[in-house]
Each structure stands twice: as structure tokens, then as C-alpha cells.
């Protein structure tokens, strides 16, 4: 990328359940450039996505966002790098996923701050929902910092859906299975709002709803009755 460039990239995986995917996304940002690397991963048997955002010019910024949902025996594997070479650069990452049945997900992330990257800010967040006893998710955030005067943080969670949220919906007459779908969609909304999808947001919500119970209830998940 050149000075002050603005780039938005979106990858959507809705592959068949017998397909393997090995994907690699790379971006290098120059001075005052801005990049958005975004991923939606719903399909495939095994899907691995490696994303590397490198900031080589002062004032550059990058953001990585992803939404993933694995069911059946699917495996989703994400490996991300936020590399800061130049000073006063900024990166932010938000990955949110859900696993159901006996599916699995693995997230491995690295924030790498070089010796000349003073004044850098870098943040990394990975949240995972486990929707069944047989599903599992693993989150491995990492920091590698070679200079002072930086602000960096990482956070990760793995666990079931919030029972208080489900109870609240059920107390208002919503059926348990529908309440679970709404909680999961609400969990994903933070990512959906940041994706450069425009009018496709409704279609993505429909795909997620179908994966929850293989059918969407009209009028409930943003799908017309």
C-alpha cells in the first residue's frame, strides 16, 4: 500500500462440508494508511486462515475482524499477526466464534512490536462460545514487544452462552431454542456491524441462523416472514 491508502477486504467462506481451505491474507501499510481485513468463516471441513498485517509507515493503522461458526465436525483454525515496524502505528483485532456439535476452533494471535515502533497501540480480542458439550475452542494470544512507550493488550474467553441473557428472553415468552439463536446472533452483532458488507448483512445473519438449527424462523432472525 502507498501513503494514505484506504483498503477494505472481506473474505466469506460458505464452502461445502467436504472441502478443505488453506488461505493466506497479507497487508503492508505505509505512512498514514488504513487497512481493514475481515473474514466470515462458516463452511468447509477444515478451514485455516493466516492473516498478517504489517505497518511499515508512521501513522499507519490496521484492523482485523472475523466471525466464525463451526458445527458438525468442522474445524476452523486462525493464525494472525499484527506487526508494527514504524512508530505511532495502531492495530486492533476482534475475532468472535461459536462452535457446536463436535466442532472445534483454534485461534493463535501475535502482536509483534519492533524496536523502532515507539508510540504504538495494539489490541487483540478473541471471544468464543461453546454451544454443546462436545464442542471445544482454544485461544492462544501472544505479545512480543521490543521497545518501550507502547500500549498493548490482549484478551480471550471461551465458554457457554450467557444464561442470564437466555433467561431474560425466556421470561418474556420466547422459546428456549429461539432464545439461544438470538443470544448467539447478538454475540456476533459486534463483528457484523464492522464488516464492509452493506446489504449483505441480512444474508449473513440468515446463514448463521441456518447453522444454529438448520432452519431460520421467519420474522425472528431478521428474515422476512
Regions picked out by a protein language model, each given a short descriptive name:
Residues 4-174, 188, 195-221, 225:
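Conserved beta-strand/loop scaffold segments within soluble protein domains that form the structured core
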Amino acid at each position: 500500500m502507498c501513503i494514505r491508502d484506504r483498503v477494505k477486504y472481506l473474505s466469506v467462506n460458505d464452502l461445502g462440508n467436504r472441502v478443505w481451505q488453506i488461505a493466506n491474507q497479507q497487508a503492508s501499510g505505509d505512512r498514514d494508511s488504513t487497512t481493514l481485513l475481515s473474514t466470515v468463516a462458516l463452511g468447509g471441513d477444515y478451514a485455516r486462515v493466516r492473516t498478517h498485517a504489517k505497518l511499515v509507515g508512521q501513522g499507519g493503522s490496521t484492523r482485523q475482524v472475523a466471525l466464525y461458526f463451526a458445527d458438525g465436525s468442522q474445524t476452523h483454525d486462525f493464525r494472525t499477526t499484527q506487526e508494527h515496524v514504524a512508530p505511532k502505528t495502531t492495530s486492533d483485532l476482534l475475532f468472535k466464534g461459536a462452535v457446536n456439535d463436535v466442532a472445534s476452533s483454534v485461534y493463535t494471535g501475535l502482536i509483534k512490536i519492533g524496536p523502532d515502533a515507539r508510540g504504538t497501540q495494539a489490541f487483540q480480542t478473541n471471544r468464543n462460545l461453546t454451544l454443546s458439550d462436545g464442542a471445544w475452542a482454544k485461544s492462544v494470544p501472544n505479545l512480543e514487544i521490543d521497545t518501550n512507550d507502547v500500549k498493548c493488550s490482549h484478551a480471550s474467553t471461551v465458554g457457554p452462552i450467557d444464561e442470564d441473557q437466555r433467561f431474560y428472553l425466556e421470561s418474556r415468552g420466547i422459546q428456549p431454542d429461539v432464545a439461544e439463536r438470538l443470544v448467539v446472533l447478538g454475540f456476533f452483532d459486534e463483528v457484523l456491524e464492522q464488516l464492509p458488507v452493506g446489504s449483505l448483512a441480512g444474508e449473513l445473519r440468515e446463514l448463521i441462523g441456518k447453522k444454529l438449527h438448520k432452519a431460520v424462523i421467519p420474522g425472528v432472525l431478521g428474515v422476512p416472514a
